[in-house]
């Protein structure tokens, strides 16, 4: 495990649930885009936020939003339906903030 910040677009609205004795947890995925040798690549990062911050995220984040999420990264192995193995990147977030798209400028 290690700490990281990832910026990407929300793939869907957050999914809120309550566990144990009412602890709020919100889950969502963001698409992180980057260029490598003139090839546009996308990696989906699964995020979870717990506690009061989860409630705030559920109220303020929406599908399509550009968001920066910071927290602890883990890799969860799983097996696809075709039997091949892969890993899902998961980020247990300790913070988030909405971002403004880069490259946009206001014309005077």
Which functions belong to the PLM regions below?
Residues 1-108:
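Single-stranded nucleic acid-binding surfaces, predominantly the OB-fold ssDNA-binding core
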């Amino acid at each position: 495990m290690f700490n990281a910040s990832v910026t990407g677009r929300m793939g869907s609205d957050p999914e809120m649930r309550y566990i144990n004795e009412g602890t709020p947890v919100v889950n969502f995925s963001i698409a992180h885009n980057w260029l490598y040798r003139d090839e546009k690549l996308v990696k989906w990062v699964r995020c979870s936020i717990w506690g009061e911050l989860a409630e705030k995220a559920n109220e303020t984040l929406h599908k399509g939003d550009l968001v920066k999420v910071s927290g602890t990264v883990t890799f969860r192995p799983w097996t696809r339906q075709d039997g091949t193995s892969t890993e899902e990147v998961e980020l247990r977030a300790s913070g988030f903030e909405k971002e403004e798209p880069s490259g946009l400028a206001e014309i005077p």
